Amino acid sequence: MFKRSIVYQLDAGAYKPTKAHSSDAGYDLYAREDVELGADKTFKVDTGVHVLIPDGYVGLVLPRSSFNCMGVATPTGVIDAGYTGSISVVLSAKSDLKIYAGNRIAQLVIVPLPEIRLVEGDVMAHKSERGCGGFGSSGR
């Protein structure tokens, strides 16, 4: 049962976002046209998909695990409510790679946003187990 519908529109030659399984968190996004990715280069690949993210939600463009295994990095993208342009996906490849029109290149996950306001305060006075430990601080 669907609780909310998100309106989308496709440019000519674009592929409809799909889910392989109804329980999947994200919709697969597809390359609209063939693209040659050069080694150690970063490219913006157009999907030709427009979505109308409602107020109180955000669209996250996330990597596909199969691309990560192929040495293709996809940084997270954010689609704010009100943006109506075509979704593009940033891809970086370790080696030369051809992406064909119709290849799945990322996934779109739409999530609700809590209403939060940022207030200034003394963060360092807050004691926690983690503290200032960041990258690699857990020893793994």
Could you tell me what each predicted segment is?
Residues 1-140:
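DUTPase catalytic domain/fold
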